[in-house]
């Protein structure tokens, strides 16, 4: 019975005169809010040809969605991942409700050629992020242990910094010893602040630098 009451609206646009993204944003503001990740996905895909949409979705966006999901809860962390990604790229921390706006401001795609390199980089970093939210996916036991300790201490404000360090390790800019030192320093720093009574919420700006 509920499906029988479902209504669809088809809007015809003129490619040269109408801005589909702006129309979509206007429609979205009148109904149930989409997540920041949903808005970014639509922004990324909307202006592409169908063949390019399929390629970007299948090769990049779908893997990003899968990798940025918690194994235990099946909770999507795509919005959080992109927020952390933007934090270390811009050295500014986006408001949780304005991640889409910040992403759109930084990446104004004109075509498939300008979009694909960004999606390639996002896909590379989400592979690191997957190990932060799912430490069991990290194959190295020592690294896995340090990530679990960081998560146990709930120092997720360090994620933007760790993503950069992890990528250096992945690209062999640093070795495993340096990675472990960085992960241990994060914990030591958090404990020292806790002991002297300093709030943990201020650490995000420190790690951002």
Language model features: what each stretch is:
Residues 1-209:
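Polyanionic (Asp/Glu-rich) segments that form extended negatively charged tracts
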């Amino acid at each position: 019975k509920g499906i029988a009451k479902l209504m669809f609206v088809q809007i015809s646009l003129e490619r040269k005169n109408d801005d589909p993204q702006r129309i979509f944003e206007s429609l979205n503001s009148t109904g149930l809010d989409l997540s920041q990740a949903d808005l970014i996905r639509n922004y990324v895909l909307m202006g592409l040809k169908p063949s390019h949409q399929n390629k970007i979705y299948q090769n990049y966006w779908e893997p990003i969605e899968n990798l940025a999901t918690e194994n235990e809860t099946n909770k999507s962390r795509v919005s959080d991942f992109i927020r952390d990604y933007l934090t270390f790229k811009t050295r500014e921390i986006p408001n949780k409700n304005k991640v889409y706006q910040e992403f759109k401001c930084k990446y104004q795609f004109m075509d498939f050629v300008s979009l694909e390199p960004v999606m390639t980089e996002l896909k590379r970093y989400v592979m690191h992020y997957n190990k932060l939210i799912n430490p069991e996916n990290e194959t190295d036991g020592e690294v896995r242990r340090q990530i679990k300790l960081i998560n146990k201490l709930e120092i997720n404000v360090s994620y933007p910094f760790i993503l950069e360090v992890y990528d250096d390790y992945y690209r062999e800019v640093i070795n495993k010893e340096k990675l472990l030192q960085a992960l241990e320093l994060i914990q030591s720093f958090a404990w020292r602040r806790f002991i002297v009574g300093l709030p943990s919420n201020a650490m995000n700006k420190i790690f951002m630098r």
